[in-house]
Amino acid sequence: MADNGQADRKERSNGVIVGTCLAFVAGMIGMAYAAVPLYDMFCRVTGYNGTTQRVEQASDLILDEKIKVTFDANVAAGLPWEFVPVQRDIDVRIGETVQIMYRAKNLASTPTTGQATFNVTPMAAGAYFNKVQCFCFTETTLEPGEEMEMPVVFFVDPEIVKPVETQGIKTLTLSYTFYPREPSKPVAQVKAKAENKL
């Protein structure tokens, strides 16, 4: 009988260990999924890692000092697009609101959807690069062979001249990478699809 009690305790102990390990693994998987959106939110709020700021209105102050902004375009594997800036660089007055264009073309024989991510280098300048309008705020769907010009309206915040780490910056690079994405579906369509599975 003593052996039965000892075996029961050992079995319960093993069950607790297995349950703890499974909870730990589930927690780690959950944290892995949560890390990307949390880090993205942190970067958008702080401008960390070259993330630009999204604003509703233009700057009230325009300085005489100019800064060169260069434009870069990339397409991730799996998205059959040609994507380029219409112009490679521009000299702008700090605080001046400017519109530039990027051009994308779908090279596939089917509609494709992409979402652009962006950053600014040097990274210290990301917090001072303000976008008023950008194609990167939403996903973009192109029909087969369709070509589209996409605007970016931005300004460099006059505050960039104050911090020591950004005072000597004379050139910024705005870089975009388009990634493939499944097109978003309206909520009613998703709900109807879920009900059909039941």
Swiss-Prot record:
Highest rank taxon of the organism: Bacteria
Pfam family, one: CtaG_Cox11
Keywords annotated in UniProt: Cell inner membrane, Cell membrane, Copper, Membrane, Signal-anchor, Transmembrane, Transmembrane helix
One of the record's GO molecular function terms: copper ion binding
Gene3D superfamilies: Ctag/Cox11
Location of this chain's protein in the cell: Cell inner membrane
One of the protein's GO biological processes: respiratory chain complex IV assembly
TM annotation in the entry: 13-35
Entry membrane topology: Single-pass type II membrane protein
UniProt GO cellular component terms: plasma membrane
Periplasmic compartment residues: 36-198
Record topological domains on the Cytoplasmic side: 1-12
HAMAP family: CtaG
Family the UniProt entry places it in: Belongs to the COX11/CtaG family.
Known function: Exerts its effect at some terminal stage of cytochrome c oxidase synthesis, probably by being involved in the insertion of the copper B into subunit I.
Name of this chain's protein: Cytochrome c oxidase assembly protein CtaG
Protein source organism: Rhizobium meliloti (strain 1021)
